[in-house]
């Protein structure tokens, strides 16, 4: 059966779900997305990825700064949609908006709830060393990711997965699971699962200062940091007084006798640095104003400063 849907989403993560709805038998009446904002070095006003897709498909676009406004709420109710699908929208939905739809507001969340409620579930899962994460389809309520769940689908986190890798994989899983959930919801063929509050954890928003590498942490922890903060904000250390971004790194040993931050060796395999415990090998680096380069290229340019046994980073 075809449902009348209002879609709310903003970043690239929401795009596969919107595309899936457009390609389905359902009808997307309107797309809500955050207002256009300055972005990049030039601070050029940019449309959200979701807005671009909506415009290309000639779907009405609505960009309120807030949904707390009574006029905006009445506009939403007047659409007489069956359900609202929310994917990383970024604005709070007040009670009146949550109650405006026959089948409620359904959210696609990038974790296995109740673990990692909040803004940064993908990054927090990697930082914590979780072996798996996934997608939860949730019936929204007034709490922060506290609603009853319609469905869940797990996804393994490999030792090499970056936040970018997981983001892309989970966005596709979310699109498929959302369509399956809508079909069951419409038929009444779905059993809602309440979240276990005792197991809940919170994925707070990533702060830029978290990206600074503390070499006294273990190599395992720092490697997770590098993976979790790729593609943003990018883990970094200091080299010759300049911030140096680390795009890719691997653990080569979980024990070491070297002091944290000391250069162990530098060769074509990478630049190996001692951590609080273990050794981290840097593979891709970037200095300010420069392109991302391989460890080999970095050694060619700065090899005279890379002296084993010396503290060169941090």
Swiss-Prot record:
Entry-linked PROSITE patterns: GART
Pfam families given in the database record: Formyl_trans_C, Formyl_trans_N
Cellular-component GO terms for this entry: cytosol
Residues bound to (6S)-5,6,7,8-tetrahydrofolate: 111-114
UniProt-listed NCBIfam families: fmt
Family: Belongs to the Fmt family.
EC number(s) given by UniProt: 2.1.2.9
HAMAP family: Formyl_trans
Keyword terms of this UniProt record: Protein biosynthesis, Transferase
Name of the protein described by the UniProt record: Methionyl-tRNA formyltransferase
Catalytic activity: L-methionyl-tRNA(fMet) + (6R)-10-formyltetrahydrofolate = N-formyl-L-methionyl-tRNA(fMet) + (6S)-5,6,7,8-tetrahydrofolate + H(+)
Sample GO molecular function, one term: methionyl-tRNA formyltransferase activity
Role played: Attaches a formyl group to the free amino group of methionyl-tRNA(fMet). The formyl group appears to play a dual role in the initiator identity of N-formylmethionyl-tRNA by promoting its recognition by IF2 and preventing the misappropriation of this tRNA by the elongation apparatus.
Lineage: Bacteria, Pseudomonadati, Pseudomonadota, Gammaproteobacteria, Legionellales
């Amino acid at each position: 059966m075809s449902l009348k849907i209002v879609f709310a989403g903003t970043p690239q993560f929401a795009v596969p779900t919107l595309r899936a709805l457009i390609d389905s038998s359902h009808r997307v009446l309107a797309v809500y997305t955050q207002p256009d904002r300055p972005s990049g070095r030039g601070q050029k006003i940019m449309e959200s990825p979701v807005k671009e897709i909506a415009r290309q498909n000639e779907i009405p676009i609505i960009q309120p700064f807030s949904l707390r406004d009574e006029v905006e709420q009445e506009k939403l109710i007047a659409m007489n949609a069956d359900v609202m699908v929310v994917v990383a929208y970024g604005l709070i939905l007040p009670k009146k908006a949550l109650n405006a739809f026959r089948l409620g507001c359904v959210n696609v969340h990038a974790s296995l709830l109740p673990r990692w409620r909040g803004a940064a579930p993908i990054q927090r899962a990697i930082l914590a060393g979780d072996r798996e994460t996934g997608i939860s389809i949730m019936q929204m309520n007034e709490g922060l990711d506290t609603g009853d769940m319609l469905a869940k689908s797990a996804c393994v986190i490999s030792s090499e997965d970056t936040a970018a890798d997981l983001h892309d994989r989970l966005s596709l899983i979310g699109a498929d699971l959302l369509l399956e959930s809508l079909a069951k919801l419409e038929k009444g063929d779905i059993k809602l699962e309440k979240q276990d509050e005792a197991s809940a954890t919170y994925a707070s928003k990533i702060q830029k200062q978290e990206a600074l590498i503390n070499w006294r942490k273990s190599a395992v922890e720092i490697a997770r940091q590098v993976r979790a903060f790729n593609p943003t904000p990018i883990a970094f250390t200091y080299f010759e007084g300049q911030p140096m971004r680390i795009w890719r790194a691997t653990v080569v040993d979980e024990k070491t006798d070297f002091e944290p931050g000391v250069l162990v060796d530098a060769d074509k395999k990478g630049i190996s640095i001692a951590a609080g415990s273990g050794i981290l090998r840097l593979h891709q680096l970037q200095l300010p104003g420069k392109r991302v380069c391989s460890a080999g290229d970095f050694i060619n340019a700065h090899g005279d400063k890379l002296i084993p046994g010396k503290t060169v980073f941090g």
